[in-house]
């Protein structure tokens, strides 16, 4: 009734009692109500979920506004299961309010688009103003202008504002350089968790740092997917180090798939519904070939490339109804 969204729905488990509040409700999970309809629209070209659930989406944002103090949210799990010399669980590397408020800003930006799509001019103005106020409050609270860093300077602290457009104009390069420096300081390893992974991966990819992404993942050490494979895991595990316990069948570390498809295979949507696709494969390191396919509304799109001497040979098959444009990186 109050607009809140639980981390799991339906709630087969009720998180109640001392210390359970953040499990009962966390913005990083609740924002799915707003994000998922747009993912559905972008992939299938169907905006019906946005129209059908617009009031619910709007109500959730209104609820978060009641929980915010000066537009800052201070509850939730944060960058759950981030990595470091500590027991995995609640975010340790990155302040929970930074993560929660960044997600609050993100879904308000989505709601601007949603209001435009349903033709609600009043809401569009309201959400536009709210986004500006959250952005200003976020930077006032977490941005250290002299150092060009956010929060603790962790990888998640820096990736979130860079990816979501919270960083002050003109400071993006300096903040990005601090992110790169932190990755190198950690031996080209990540320190992010369930939430921060995606923003770290896509921040690097969108800034042309695929080589660093490849270096960060092409090893068999902890933290990394290679270690899980070496350990013998047949599904993704909840912790970067499966030996530490928790679930051995958990999809939450699977954000690297987006990099596989968008960057390595180079499959990028140019139009909602993917009736138009841009193919822009990226070569990295000693990788000799990549092959990928995805099911579209129109059929299967397949892309493969391989190195032939000092050249790259690209092949693709697209279904009828899907227009493809091949770009050279």
Predicted regions and their residues:
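Active-site acid/base region of carbohydrate-active enzymes
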Residues: 1-11, 43-102, 115-163, 170, ...
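Structured core of small recognition/catalytic domains
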Residues: 1-27, 37
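Solvent-exposed loop and edge beta-strand segments that line ligand/cofactor-binding
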Residues: 16-30, 86-103, 140-158, 164, ...
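Well-ordered alpha-helical scaffold segments within catalytic/enzyme domains
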Residues: 33-49, 102-120, 159-170, 199-207, ...
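Hydrophobic alpha-helix feature that most strongly marks membrane-spanning transmembrane helices
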Residues: 45, 69, 116, 143, ...
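Flexible glycine/proline-rich, aromatic-decorated loop/lid segments
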Residues: 69-88, 170-184, 189, 221-238
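Non-catalytic C-terminal accessory modules of carbohydrate-active enzymes
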Residues: 129, 211-329
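Repeat-solenoid scaffold signature
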Residues: 185-224, 231
């Amino acid at each position: 009734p109050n607009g809140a969204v639980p981390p799991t729905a339906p709630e087969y488990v009720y998180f109640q009692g001392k210390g359970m509040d953040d499990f009962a409700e966390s913005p990083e999970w609740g924002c799915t109500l707003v994000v998922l309809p747009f993912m559905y629209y972008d992939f299938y070209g169907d905006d019906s979920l946005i129209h059908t659930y617009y009031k619910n989406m709007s109500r959730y944002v209104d609820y978060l506004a009641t929980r915010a103090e000066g537009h800052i949210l201070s509850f939730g799990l944060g960058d759950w299961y981030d990595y470091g010399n500590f027991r995995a669980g609640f975010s340790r590397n990155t302040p929970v309010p930074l993560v929660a408020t960044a997600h609050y800003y993100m879904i308000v930006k989505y709601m601007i688009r949603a209001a435009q799509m349903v033709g609600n001019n009043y809401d569009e103005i309201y959400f536009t103003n709210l986004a500006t106020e959250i952005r200003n409050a976020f930077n006032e609270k977490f941005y250290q202008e002299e150092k060009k860093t956010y929060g603790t300077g962790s990888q998640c602290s820096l990736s979130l504002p860079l990816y979501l457009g919270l960083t002050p104009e003109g400071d993006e390069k300096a903040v990005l350089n601090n992110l790169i420096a932190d990755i190198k300081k950690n031996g080209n390893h990540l320190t992010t968790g369930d939430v921060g992974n995606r923003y770290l991966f896509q921040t690097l990819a969108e800034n042309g740092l695929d080589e660093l992404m490849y270096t960060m993942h092409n090893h068999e050490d902890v933290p990394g997917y290679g270690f899980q494979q070496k350990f013998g895991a047949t599904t993704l595990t909840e912790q970067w180090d499966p030996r530490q316990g928790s679930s051995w069948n958990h999809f939450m570390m699977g954000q690297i798939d987006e990099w596989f498809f968008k960057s390595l295979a180079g499959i990028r949507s140019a139009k909602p519904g993917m009736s138009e696709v841009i193919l822009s494969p990226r070569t990295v390191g000693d990788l000799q070939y990549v092959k990928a396919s995805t099911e579209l509304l129109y059929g299967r799109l397949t892309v493969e490339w391989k190195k032939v001497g000092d050249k790259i040979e690209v092949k693709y098959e697209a279904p009828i109804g899907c227009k493809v444009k091949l770009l050279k990186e």
